[in-house]
Swiss-Prot record:
Keyword Iron carried by entry: no
Tissue distribution of the protein: Expressed by the venom duct.
Domains (record comment): The presence of a 'disulfide through disulfide knot' structurally defines this protein as a knottin. The cysteine framework is VI/VII (C-C-CC-C-C).
Designated name of the protein: Conotoxin VnMKLT2-011
Subcellular locations according to the entry: Secreted
Native organism taxonomy: Eukaryota, Metazoa, Spiralia, Lophotrochozoa, Mollusca
UniProt signal peptide: 1-23
Gene Ontology cellular-component annotations: extracellular region
Length: 72
């Protein structure tokens, strides 16, 4: 009876560890995929949005301090 209990405890711990490592991997890839989708969804920044890494849309000018300019 004691051996069966030990085997069950080890099996539960192993399955829990497998689920945790799988969940971490999925979340990691989801974050990368999400940031790529956001980056690809906007080709220019609208009025009031940052223009440090993305150019302003037509008719807007990038103005402001070097650390955080915005499109006006």
């Amino acid at each position: 009876m004691m051996k069966l209990t030990c085997v069950l405890i080890i099996a539960v711990l192993f399955l829990t560890a497998c689920q945790l490592t799988t969940a971490e991997t999925r979340d990691e890839y989801r974050a990368v995929r999400s940031s790529d989708e956001v980056r690809n969804s906007r080709s220019c920044s609208g009025s009031g949005y940052g223009c440090k890494n993305t150019p302003c849309c037509a008719g807007l000018t990038c103005r402001g301090p070097r650390q955080g300019p915005i499109c006006l």
